Amino acid sequence: DLSDTRDASFSPDGRTIAFSSGNNLYLYDIVGDSVRPITTDGAWNRIINGTTDWVYEEECAFTKAYAFSPDGQKIAYLRFDESRVPVFEMMRYDGKLYNEAYSFKYPKAGDANSVVDLYVYDLKTGETERVDVGPDRGQYILQPEWTPDGRLCFQRMNRRQNHFEAVLCNP
């Protein structure tokens, strides 16, 4: 079921569309009219691939958490492990006779945030490689992008948000 599709983006050559759905990242081949998953471990309130969790969406101001390389052969993407983040529950008031509770991961001050990893997926080989983002598992990993010459750039910032680095690497 791909009904909750979001954050769609064309590849540089315009032949492929990447998108997130069901907490997984997918590729749609326009010419072949076929969809293939890049990730399969996405699960509600546990793992998010290719799009951000609540903290990143609200506090870091972005949702699309992947980027095509300039040659369109690779995709860098963020993977959010929310398993340690506490669940927050609120009532949905949507006009029904009985309201339903909506549960989602929502860290309050001092609670655990998602553990974020950066991966690079090779469209030709289908292989995925984890990028070393440093030893601080509680840091923010922001805005994965590619330079015109094919190097991967991302930003990292500690949770106190008083130390920021731009990192350039060759995955």
Locate each region found by the language model:
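Structural WD40 beta-propeller signal
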Residues: 11-13, 69, 147
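Structural motif
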Residues: 22-28, 84-91, 115-117, 161-168
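Short loop/turn segments that connect beta-strands within beta-propeller blades
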Residues: 30-33, 122-126, 170-171
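Asp-box/WD-like beta-propeller blade repeats and closely related beta-sheet repeat scaffolds
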Residues: 1-65
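Long hydrophobic segments that form regular secondary structure
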Residues: 122-158
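Hydrophobic beta-strand positions that form the internal "hydrophobic ladder"
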Residues: 14-18, 72-75, 150-154
